Every structure is written in structure tokens, then in C-alpha cells.
């Protein structure tokens, strides 16, 4: 059964209220403390959260299905139990979506641009990640990261973000793995065909970094996660560049590609 990642996180919470709701990467290892300076945590008052990517001192990119009330955004976090001197908390001043109704599908427009209530400064643990200048190539090695469950379907929640490498496939691989996908899509298909490594649960909204370049946003995949032959889908950032850049430049009525 294919589920949007944040829905899977809600199910995990219902099954395990005693556990902390967080998100990690299955099959990964603890990220190097300096490799995720752009990675943000997004919480609401219930504690549920997604990931996101700082792309500018005032802007974060995440998934549309991560939209929530009372959003709190944390930057500069590594270990949940250890607060860095430069760790920051921000709120969403404005949120932008491709459609005014905030509709999206598993294969289209699952993207949200967040303007922070005030800018952040670069520091030892905080720095933005540049937007891509070119689309990624099939066969690229891509990096995934997050604070979520490292096991599925039962949840295990570490205190530090985990990172892992996966491969970028032709979109047809995901069409073969997941029923109902259209012939074309503004998404990227990535994973490990033998299984065992994957984003999962609430990893939604976090980055897919291919050959060192920010290329995708964690959107959705199979449940349980990390199953053989079931790569996940990621919103293709490159296709939304004009929309992102227009909004940041002040054209808040900019429209997404059809």
C-alpha cells in the first residue's frame, strides 16, 4: 500500500503514543554533524513534524503535505538532547503553494515554500543549500537524511539525524513499482532496488541531494518502507525553480508549471 509519508507518521503515532514522533532514514548511519547545516525540523503543537531545507536566510523548502498549523521550525539541530549555541527557532511568516486550494497529488505539486518570520545567519551548524542549476541524471548517487524512524513498520526513533546513499532511477521504475502513476510526472524516482535503505515515516519535506546538489523533496513511497523493488518519489525541485525564484524575488502571485 502506498502512503504519503506524513500519513504513515500519523499511523506510527497512533500505534506508539509513548514514543517520540520523529523521522529518520532506514538503513543509514548518523550524519556527520557538519553535513546537514541546511536541514530543518518542522513541528506543530502536537509534536508531529516533517523535514525541510533552508535555501536562503529567510526561506525553507518542504512538501505541501507537511503544511500544519502552529508550525515551529528548528535550525542547527543535531542531537535532540544537546542544544548548540547557534541553534535557532523560527515560525512561518508566510507559506506558498502551487495551488490556492493547496491541492497536490502523489506525483504533482507536493511542494511548499516557507518564509521565516525573521532571517537566520550562517553559523557553524546553519547554512543554506543552493538550488540546482541543472536537473539530475539517471544513475546519480543521491543522499537522503532526516530524524525519523529507522525501522518499519514498527518505529524506532534515534536522537540524531541519519544519512544514507540511494540511486536515482528512471521514472518508469517507480511506475512499475507503484500502481496508478501517470505517464509523466514532476517527480524523481530514487531508492535501492534490493531494499533496506529508504526515507520513511515523517521524512517528508527533507532533501534529496544528488551528486552534491539539492534536487528533490521527500514526498511519498511504500509502506512498510525500504521494501525491495519499491523506490520512493521525490518532488523534482528543478522543475519549480521559476516559481521558487519569483516568489523569493517578491512576485507572490507567481504560478507553478502546469
UniProtKB/Swiss-Prot annotation:
Instruction: Tell me which UniProt keywords the record has, alphabetically.
Output: Disulfide bond, Fibrinogenolytic toxin, Glycoprotein, Hemostasis impairing toxin, Hydrolase, Protease, Secreted, Serine protease, Signal, Toxin, Zymogen
Q: Which residues form the propeptide?
A: 19-24
Ways its activity is controlled: Inhibited by diisopropylfluorophosphate (DFP), but not by SBTI, Antithrombin III/heparin and BPTI, probably due to steric hindrance caused by its huge carbohydrate moietie.
Q: Catalytic center at which residues?
A: 65 (charge relay system), 110 (charge relay system), 204 (charge relay system)
Q: What are the disulfide bonds?
A: 31-163, 50-66, 98-256, 142-210, 174-189, 200-225
Q: Which residues form the Peptidase S1 domain?
A: 25-249
- Chain positions carrying an annotated carbohydrate: 32, 44, 103, 121, 133, 154, 170, 211, 251, 255
Which terms does the record give in the GO molecular function aspect?
A: serine-type endopeptidase activity; toxin activity
The record's EC number reads 3.4.21.-
| pH-dependent activity | Optimum pH is 3-9.
Protein localization: Secreted
Signal peptide region: 1-18
Give tissue specificity per the record. Expressed by the venom gland.
Query: What GO biological process terms are annotated to this protein in UniProt?
Result: proteolysis
Q: Which GO terms describe its cellular component?
A: extracellular region; secretory granule
PROSITE patterns the UniProt entry points to: TRYPSIN_DOM, TRYPSIN_HIS, TRYPSIN_SER
Q: How is it modified after translation?
A: N- and O-glycosylated. The glycosylation has a stabilizing effect on the protein. However, the removal of part of the carbohydrates enhances the proteolytic activity of the SVSP towards human and rat fibrinogen.
User: Per the UniProt entry, how does temperature affect activity?
Assistant: Thermostable.
Task: Report TM segments.
Answer: none
Which PANTHER family does the UniProt entry name for this protein?
A: KALLIKREIN-1 (PTHR24271:SF47), KALLIKREIN-RELATED (PTHR24271)
* Quaternary state and interactors: Monomer.
State the protein's purpose.
Snake venom serine protease that has a potent and selective fibrinogenolytic activity. Preferentially cleaves the alpha-chain (FGA) of human and rat fibrinogen at Arg-|-Gly bonds, and slowly digests the beta-chain (FGB). In vivo, completely avoids thrombus formation induced in rat, decreases the fibrinogen plasma level and prolonges the recalcification time. Possesses esterolytic and amidolytic activities.
Further details from the record: Negative results: does not have coagulant activities and does not cause unspecific degradation of plasma proteins. Does not degrade gamma chain of fibrinogen (FGG) and is not active towards fibrin clots.
Member of which family? Belongs to the peptidase S1 family. Snake venom subfamily.
Query: What is the name attached to this protein's record?
Result: Snake venom serine protease BPA
Recite the lineage of the species.
Eukaryota, Metazoa, Chordata, Craniata, Vertebrata
